[in-house]
A protein has these predicted regions:
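Bacterial Sec-dependent N-terminal signal peptides
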Residues: 1-22
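A domain-start/cap signature at the N-terminus of enzymes
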Residues: 18-61, 99, 130-133, 137, ...
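C-terminal catalytic histidine-bearing segment of alpha/beta-hydrolase fold enzymes
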Residues: 35, 183, 199-262
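Gly/Ser-rich "nucleophile elbow"/oxyanion-hole loop immediately N-terminal to the catalytic nucleophile
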Residues: 52-57, 112-159
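The conserved beta1-alpha1 loop
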Residues: 65-67, 204
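Active-site machinery of serine-nucleophile hydrolases
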Residues: 68-132
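Alpha-helical scaffolding within the catalytic cores
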Residues: 81-92, 184-193, 197, 214, ...
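Primarily recognizes the serine-hydrolase "nucleophile elbow" in alpha/beta-hydrolase
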Residues: 143-196
Length: 262
């Protein structure tokens, strides 16, 4: 697990953010916030709004589930993890696509989904505290009228631990999201029928030794068997960093933001 975290930390530095100043500038464009519930729990998240918003217009929202390296309580790591913040800037999410971006943070020692990543399969467990509060925070953000979120264009994406989170979120809410991009994650194959109508594009490296590519293959196959038409990109020679391929794919971003829930 230590080597995995170090790999994640190394990878975020090089592909998408070049220096500390750039990182600080990008982070400053994301507003820090915390959801608190009556039971005393709290959930940290950051959000960024479209660069230009006009009254009466609705805008898309991208929900991002970070990987294990982004855990903590600094309300920064979730965007620094694997270079997500730089990738989103490069893709022009808030500028060219006029999109909201929402990124919550899992505390250290916790997970989006309470299953071990080395498993070759799992049944969907009880919702984790982090996932439950993330969904509550997303609901609050999306329903806030001042944010002008288009409920038919809410997208979800996540990598590694967040890839599991992405599958978990769409399994729990197959009719909430307009499209999903789970990257090197895994889900519950028995949900193929419920997910057959949701646009999904999964990514995995064929040399991934942290989370086996069979986890993505199995989910895609389950959806296809149920009559769905998911997309799947398995990157030849790639280890546990297929998010670099996904984020560098202009086709993926175009596909994602063209989706609209019926």
């Amino acid at each position: 697990m230590k080597s995995f975290c170090l790999l994640t930390l190394f990878l975020f530095i090089s592909p998408f953010v070049t220096n500390a100043q750039s990182m600080d500038e990008l982070l400053s464009s994301y507003v820090p916030a915390t959801l608190k519930n009556p039971e005393g729990g709290k959930f940290n998240y950051r959000y960024s709004t479209p660069d230009k918003m006009e009254k009466g217009t609705k805008y898309p929202l991208l929900v991002f589930f970070h990987g294990a390296g982004g855990r903590g309580n600094d309300n920064k790591g979730q965007l620094v993890d694997a270079g997500g913040i730089g990738a989103f800037d490069k893709a022009g999410l808030t500028s060219r696509r006029n999109s909201h971006v929402f990124a919550g943070q899992v505390p250290k020692g916790e997970r989006w989904v309470d299953v071990h990543w080395s498993l070759l399969g799992h049944k969907m467990p009880k919702v984790s505290d982090s996932m439950r509060m993330a969904l509550e925070a997303i609901d609050a953000y999306a329903s806030d009228e001042k944010n002008q979120v288009d409920p038919k264009r809410i997208y979800v994406m996540g990598l590694s631990m967040g890839g599991y989170g992405t599958w978990d979120a769409i399994q729990r809410r197959p009719d909430f999201f307009a499209a999903a991009v789970p990257i090197c994650g895994g889900g519950d194959k028995s949900f193929g029928e419920k997910l057959k109508g949701l646009p999904v594009w999964a990514w995995h490296g064929d040399k991934d030794r942290v989370i086996k590519p069979s986890r993505s293959r199995d989910m895609i196959e389950a959806i296809k068997k149920a009559g769905g038409n998911p997309k799947y990109s398995e990157i030849k020679g790639r280890g546990h960093n297929s998010w670099t391929d996904a984020w560098n794919s202009k086709e993926m971003w175009e596909w994602l933001y063209s989706q609209k829930r019926r």
